């Protein structure tokens, strides 16, 4: 669905299909990706704490209400009824179950995350969330369950994998070059072949 806001007559409807920030981050192989809601202090504190412990960069999407331009934009996730009906809490190692009476669940079928009624499946088919999967495809599929805060929406940590950071890789590359060719000297570099005089 295209998104719109009643805040301005000029910008009633967005022409372009907005991209999904979570999907972009996961598609770019981000090693830590999470989503929270500004009004949920406990969830936000948990997500920020996990991000601070993560080695490397962390991407966090926070649904933040703006009472000027888009007030009540996240009511489907923050209202008393919406919180129970639509929030899909992702907790590492736990089955993904939600709904007012835990009547809904998430399954992974053919690599795609789907929302199903628990009455229609066996509990063994319910997806058990794993933030440490090296392959981001499941996390990516979870990010596609919603596009904006409308209807059932996953929140929490989607992906949290350990790997060498960019900084560590660059330092390692420099150290390897030093071992192979020595420390190198700037004067030697300046006077090396391939230089010329400008008259």
Predicted regions and their residues:
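Structural motif
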Residues: 23, 31-34, 57-59, 153-157
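Structural signal for hydrophobic packing residues in well-ordered secondary-structure cores
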Residues: 26-29, 48, 52-55, 146, ...
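ATP/pyrophosphate-binding catalytic subdomain of soluble kinases
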Residues: 34-89
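Flexible, low-complexity linker and terminal segments
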Residues: 68-199
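Single conserved hydrophobic/aromatic residue that forms the stacking wall/gate
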Residues: 1-7, 11
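Conserved thiamine diphosphate
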Residues: 9-50
């Amino acid at each position: 669905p295209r998104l719109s806001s009643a805040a301005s007559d000029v910008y009633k409807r967005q022409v372009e299909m907005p991209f999904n920030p979570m999907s972009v981050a996961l598609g770019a192989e981000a090693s830590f990706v999470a989503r929270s809601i500004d009004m949920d202090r406990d969830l936000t504190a948990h997500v920020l704490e996990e991000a601070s412990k993560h080695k490397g960069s962390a991407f966090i999407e926070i649904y933040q209400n703006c009472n000027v331009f888009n007030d009540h934009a996240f009511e489907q996730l923050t209202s008393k009824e919406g919180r129970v009906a639509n929030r899909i809490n992702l907790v590492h190692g736990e089955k993904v179950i939600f709904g007012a009476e835990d009547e809904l669940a998430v399954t992974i079928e053919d690599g795609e995350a789907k929302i199903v009624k628990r009455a229609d499946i066996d509990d063994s088919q319910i997806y058990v969330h794993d933030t440490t999967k090296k392959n981001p495809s499941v996390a990516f599929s979870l990010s596609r369950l919603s596009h904006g805060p409308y209807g059932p929406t996953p929140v929490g940590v989607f992906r949290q994998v350990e790997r060498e950071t960019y900084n560590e890789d660059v330092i390692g590359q420099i150290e390897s070059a030093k071992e192979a060719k020595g420390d190198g000297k700037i004067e030697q570099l300046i006077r090396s072949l391939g230089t010329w005089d400008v008259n």
